[in-house]
């Protein structure tokens, strides 16, 4: 087993064990939401790290450095806005993600070109790809 595959498996296991980091007192007031904010209060049990409090995001929860930020498939995620940007992608180590601002017509062109070049498109399902290729 290669080192890369081992690290990808380790990354997946670490992600499964990683707790969901929620903002302090998120359950008291729906207005503040659950998105993570570091606790700064003088008497905050969460900041101190009391065992019966929610987990605080720290360096120890990070994944392996070599595979950090990669797509679960192991490919590097590249944002694409047009067909020209597809040409610069290396299909062996990179995959494309079509930007949200791209319309349907250009999206179809990008999917067709990506299929020709053998590039994986992350945010288009297999059914949509087949539909786009048949047009």
From Swiss-Prot:
Gene Ontology cellular component list: cytosolic large ribosomal subunit
Molecular function in Gene Ontology: structural constituent of ribosome
SUPFAM superfamilies, alphabetized: Ribosomal protein L32e
Any coiled-coil regions, as ranges: none
Pfam families in alphabetical order: Ribosomal_L32e
PANTHER family noted in UniProt: 60S RIBOSOMAL PROTEIN L32 AND DNA-DIRECTED RNA POLYMERASE II, SUBUNIT N, RIBOSOMAL PROTEIN L32
Protein name per UniProt: Large ribosomal subunit protein eL32
Species of origin: Methanococcus maripaludis (strain C7 / ATCC BAA-1331)
Source organism phylogeny: Archaea, Methanobacteriati, Methanobacteriota, Methanomada group, Methanococci
Gene name of the encoded protein: rpl32e
